[in-house]
Each structure stands twice: as C-alpha cells, then as structure tokens.
C-alpha cells in the first residue's frame, strides 16, 4: 500500500520507505536482528503497538547479551593467562633442573621463588573458584598446560621439604599447602577422586589428557 508521502505500509505492523522489499518474514527477521544488535532502524519503522512495545525489550535483551559476552571474555582470558604463565614458569624450572638444585647441600636461600610459585597456585585456585568453566579449557601446548606441569610441581614440593636448609623446607611446606588447597578444590568442585593430594592431582593430570610422570 503506497502512502502520499512516498512510503508503503504493512497493515498494522510496520512502515516501509519507498523501495524497501515487501516480505513478512524478512521484515520480521530484520526488525529482530537490528533490535537485538542495538543498531536502530533504517527503512523499517514499527507502528503496531505490541511491536513498538516489544522492540525496546529486544534492544535491552541484545544489550544485556552483548554486555554479558564481553564481561565473560574479560574474566576468562586473564584467568587463563595467569594459569598459562604459571605453567610456563614451572616448565622453565624443569628445563633448568631446579629440583636438583634444591637437593644440593649449599642450595641458596636468598630467593623467594618457591613462595612466588605457591602464590601463583593460590591465584589459579581463586580463578577456578570465580570462573569454574576455566577448568574445562584444554591446552594444545603442553608447556602452557597446568596439568602437564603438575607432576613437576609435586617434585618441587618433595625436594624442598627434604632439603637440609631450614628456609627451603619452610618454602616447601608453603608450596605443599598451596597444592593441598588446590587438590581439595578439585575434589569438592569438580569431583576428582583420590585419597591424598597426590592422587587427586594425578587425576587432574589424566583428566586433561596428560601422563603422570613423577620422579622417584
């Protein structure tokens, strides 16, 4: 239907400017997409009262979904970044034979490396509490996988607690406490089974597709 001002009208639904296609389904889809996308209307203007009421509701829904998606990505990627950083750091320690260094009688006590590793484990545990879905992210690169680095973390803890240097033993106990807390969280939150911290962490390693390889 042509109007005097050059527009056409879909009866009791929307107004169309001259040249716009007349398709019930296409126009309904168009209205929904531009509203959900918070883009605004161009050549289609709702005139039906119910459509005019529903349009801003759709716009609010679209804006809420967009905000939620951006917030989700903003939370997930920093958490994954911290976990990957810890994993790479542990692999670098393994590459440089840090367990053997801890076993030396003259091992240095002037660094806080084990404390920093324990603090990073605690951060990962908090991230898993706040963003439980990050547990299910698998890494294709083993050096960025916390599960792949877990056996060496346990070796670090054992070597530090067996050290003849009191300060290193204290740092080893701190590291083990962080691993114990992480294992408890794995057990209660994600149902990983085991009678000890080591068994639960080994379950985590296998759950992420890696082999359990620990020093004897």
Predicted feature locations:
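Soluble C-terminal extramembrane regulatory/interaction domains of multi-pass membrane proteins
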Residues: 94-216
């Amino acid at each position: 239907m042509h109007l005097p001002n050059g527009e056409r009208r879909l009866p009791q639904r929307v107004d169309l400017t001259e040249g716009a296609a007349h398709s019930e389904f296409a126009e309904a889809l168009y209205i929904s997409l531009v509203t959900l996308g918070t883009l605004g209307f161009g050549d289609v203007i709702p005139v039906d009262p119910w459509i005019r009421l529903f349009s801003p509701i759709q716009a609010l829904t679209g804006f809420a979904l967009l905000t939620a998606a951006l917030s989700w990505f903003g939370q997930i990627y920093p958490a994954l970044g911290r976990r990957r950083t810890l994993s790479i750091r542990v692999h670098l320690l393994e590459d440089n034979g840090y367990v053997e260094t801890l076993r030396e009688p003259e091992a240095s006590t002037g660094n806080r490396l084990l404390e920093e590793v324990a603090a990073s484990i605690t951060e990962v545990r908090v991230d898993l509490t706040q963003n439980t879905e990050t547990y299910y992210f698998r890494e294709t690169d083993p050096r960025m996988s916390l599960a792949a680095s877990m056996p060496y973390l346990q070796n670090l803890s054992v070597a530090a607690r067996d050290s003849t240097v009191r300060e290193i033993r204290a740092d080893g106990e701190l590291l083990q406490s962080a691993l114990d807390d992480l294992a408890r969280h794995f057990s209660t939150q994600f149902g990983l089974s085991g009678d000890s911290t080591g068994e639960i962490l080994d379950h985590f390693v296998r759950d992420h597709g890696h082999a359990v390889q620990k020093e004897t």
